């Protein structure tokens, strides 16, 4: 098994600002990392897969980067609608793991 450590657990952002979320893996997983957005009462939404590929229909304000053990999700031009909890999810051989989540609070 492997672990994903996500930081910070919570972050406050101003509208128009930038948010950076980090995800560190205990094993090198290449680019097998995805990012999800979760809002209350809604299923998780895939934002990024293979570390940096934007999922269909997702705003280019979301950017994924990294490989191996260090990954980053950057949200630029933060909007009120970005208030949510964000998770990284990695795959290592047959095993999958999620980070602990980052709550993004948007102040307008």
From Swiss-Prot:
Residue ranges of the region described as Framework-3: 57-88
Region (Complementarity-determining-1): 24-34
Cited Gene3D superfamilies: Immunoglobulins (2.60.40.10)
Region (Complementarity-determining-3): 89-97
Segments of this protein annotated with the region Framework-1: 1-23
Record bears the keyword Oxidoreductase: no
Protein's GO biological process: adaptive immune response
Region described as Framework-4: 98-107
GO CC annotations on file: immunoglobulin complex
Domain of life according to the entry: Eukaryota
Coiled coil segments of this chain: none
Alphabetical UniProt keywords: Adaptive immunity, Immunity, Immunoglobulin
Pfam families xrefs: V-set
Region (Complementarity-determining-2): 50-56
Residue ranges, annotated region (Framework-2): 35-49
Other facts: This chain was obtained from antibody to Micrococcus lysodeikticus cell wall and was isolated from the serum of a single rabbit.
Protein name: Ig kappa chain V region 120
